[in-house]
Amino acid sequence: MIGKAHLGPIPQTDTRAGYIAQQPAIDRAISRVLEGGSYILGREVESFEAAFADFVGVAHAIGCASGTDAIELALRACKIGSGDLVFTVSHTAVATVAAIERVGATAVLIDVEPGTYTMAPHELSRALQVPRTGRPAAVLPVHLYGQPAELSTLCDLARANGLRLIEDCAQSHGALYRGRPTGSFGDIGCFSFYPTKNLGALGDGGMVVASSLALAGALREMREYGWRERYVSACVGINSRLDSIQAAILEVKLGSLAADNARRSAIADRYDSGLAALPLTLPKRRADATHVFHQYVIRLAQRDALRDWLHAAGIGTGIHYPVPVHLQPAYRGRLAAGPSGLGVTERAARQILSLPIYPQLSEDMIDRIITEIRGFFSRFR
């Protein structure tokens, strides 16, 4: 520790700072909703849905209660359930796999690429050639840390095998793959608005996006008990509605998302430059994609020691994620994997560390973080 803890803590993420940055506009939006008296769905949600659909470049956006529900609704709308296989990754938030199991389907876990930590297309290709009990139904890649997965190859594999492609975009708001937004490639894109996301609510929220009118209609029904008309269920659905206050807040914040993502990218550039000479692995950026740096993740063998060092200096870090889904107690020993196993995933979980990154991170804060990391290596080299 260089001795700068007295300067005040630097959190790994700071949702309050994001609110303060837009407080007048957010407060006005909240007041408008409160005074209007409509708090579930309604005009505010419809307005945000239209704005978000335009942002992603799709015809339809349907608000829901969370990113987890977004994946569940997507699977249900695609008629995926018991006896079906969904190919996804273990290096993800558990919500990805939990949603698959909530519809009764079975997750088949594919290893990730060592540089991007997104689904490895060659591993998916091998897994699709292995005979299995159950019907292969969908590929569900995760655009992790703000980095798009290798969508061209994944889309080709899904199409060639007659599978749905459902994108987990919980961490990739505004990320581009070959110039197109994530969420616009698959049958359905699934977004989370958890407060720490690049586009975060002041509570929970989610969104499913689709270009198919039929899928959009099914999603709208299923998010509200399967209602086609009030109190009459045309299909089995769930209760997963985006509330009006969160929609109003999110529409305000959507207006600054491009600038916020640009700031995240600038912070990542500073880290890249300041840490380049050190014996650690920096994030890899796809040449044909735009990374929006939901997380800035470094990798090193001394991960835990560096984390302790930064904590002592008042600098917060995270591990995304410390235990792969297939090794967590609730799932250990009962999830299938691709033929090569999950070695890349398991090694990454032991070595990755997420540094502070959010739009309000100041240049002085960035300097301090870089200085502390350099100090760690000077001390222990």
Segments the model singles out, each with a brief description of its role:
Residues G115-A201, V209, S354:
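Active-site phosphate-binding strand-loop segment of PLP-dependent enzymes
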